[in-house]
Amino acid sequence: LAKQSEFNNVGKIWINTYFSGSAVLISDNYVLSAAHNVIESDTRIDTINNNGQIFYANVPINHRVVKSDSLFVELAGKRHPVEKVIVHPKYLSDIDQGEYDIVLLKLKENIKEIDPANLSYSTDEINSNVTGVGYGATGIANKEEVSMEMEKIAGQNVVDSIGGLKENNLNIYLYCDFDSPNDQTTNKIGSPEPRKLEYLCAAGDSGGGLFREISKGNWELIGICKGNEFNHKQFQKTIHYGQIMRWTRIAPFQEWISKNCM
């Protein structure tokens, strides 16, 4: 599925030699991704309470946007240098909250050999059959182990819910849960029936695209991967099944995207 030519516009973000996440080409020289892919931070040790479970973790502090001369976008195996980084201002206003997690990257050179994604500004995404594409970790749904191969993967799901904060009077998130074919109690929102290639986004998928096929071979981009809302108690019971992933919706950001790159 990921090897379909329609998804050649999904690539990788590199901070020098460090793989940071996924991205989607939306014009000859602009790429959309998740803002957190271009943020550097220092860290300190702290405790985190996740649904009553206490963890020790490296908590990021002193956030800053990566300089453009350290950023590269890899498409079809070729790395392209970044000229300009445009992070959504509401993300920068409170990076710790992580809302409005979207960034535009202007490339130094035009990309002619890859068709950019078609952006969808429609607001009828609920219950849509969708395909997520990115370079995230892979694994088996009922096993804890995952591997980071940095290979393009794709999976299917359904937009189960729309919510979150608002931009231009539109909620900014699309939600999909990871349904099990054998245990409907893992269903959190929407239909309990999984798609044939039902999947959950993972580390590395951030910034990748959520696509909807509107006619045979004609895909449109409706979301950018933000990540999943990890529920530790659910993980203890059903591993990856029952987790919920979030995608930053394209529609609310039409004005911002158009103003900055179109």
Positions of the model-derived regions?
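A conserved glycine-rich beta-strand in the N-terminal activation segment of trypsin-fold
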Residues: 10-28, 96-97
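Short, solvent-exposed loop/turn segments that connect beta-strands within catalytic domains
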Residues: 93-97, 143-147, 165-170, 214-220, ...
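Conserved active-site neighborhood of the chymotrypsin/trypsin-like protease fold
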Residues: 29-41, 81, 86, 91-123, ...
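Glycine-centered tight beta-turn/hairpin loop motif at sheet-sheet or coil-to-beta transitions
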Residues: 16-18, 77-80, 217
